[in-house]
Every structure is written in C-alpha cells, then in structure tokens.
Amino acid sequence: MEKVLCKDIMKGETYWELYRCTERMNFDSTEKLKKKNKEVIKYLSKLKDSGRSEEAIMLFKKDQIAWKNYVVHRCAYKGHSYDKDSYVYFSNKDLCEAVENYRRIESLDGELNIP
C-alpha cells in the first residue's frame, strides 16, 4: 500500500494543514535526497578507472553545491512577493524546496545508470 505523505493531516479545514504538509514534504524530500546522494557517491566510488572515482566524487559534490545554490535563489525568487515573516512565505519556500528536491532525485536517477 502506498503511503500518502499528508493524508493524516489534510482534512480541508484550515490553512495550518497546508503549512504542516509543505513542511513535511520538505523534510521527506530532503531525507530522500540525502539518501540518493549517498547512493551516487557509493556508485562513483566503485568506478574502475584509477583516480577517476575521486575526481567523479569531487565533481558530484561541486555539482550538488551549485544545485543547492540554484534552489536557494530559485525559491527566493518565487517567494519574493510574500511577507518574509508570514506562514505563506514559509509554506511557499518549503513547497518550492520540496519540488526541487524531488526533481533533483529524478534527475540523479537518470544519470550514469545509477541505481
């Protein structure tokens, strides 16, 4: 049975449900991305070419840093019109980061035949 991430909190009664759900989505996507990053590094560490493994891991880590920078700026841009102290701002930020994390996971799934 497939687990629905926010089923237990989404009753359709308050905005708080939405805020909690986006927070949960961000946490879930962050944990899944951390796991995927570990899988990628493990895969890259097994490359047979001497010295290529370390270079590949270093380049992947740099790519990940650049991607995180993209997410920070992308989500700041998408939420620039909201009051920075509002729940709407934080919910929008959480949702944006979660979406980008899930996209990154999909992207990594398709690279280098990484399982």
Where are these regions (language model features)?
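N-terminal alpha-helical modules
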Residues: 1-115
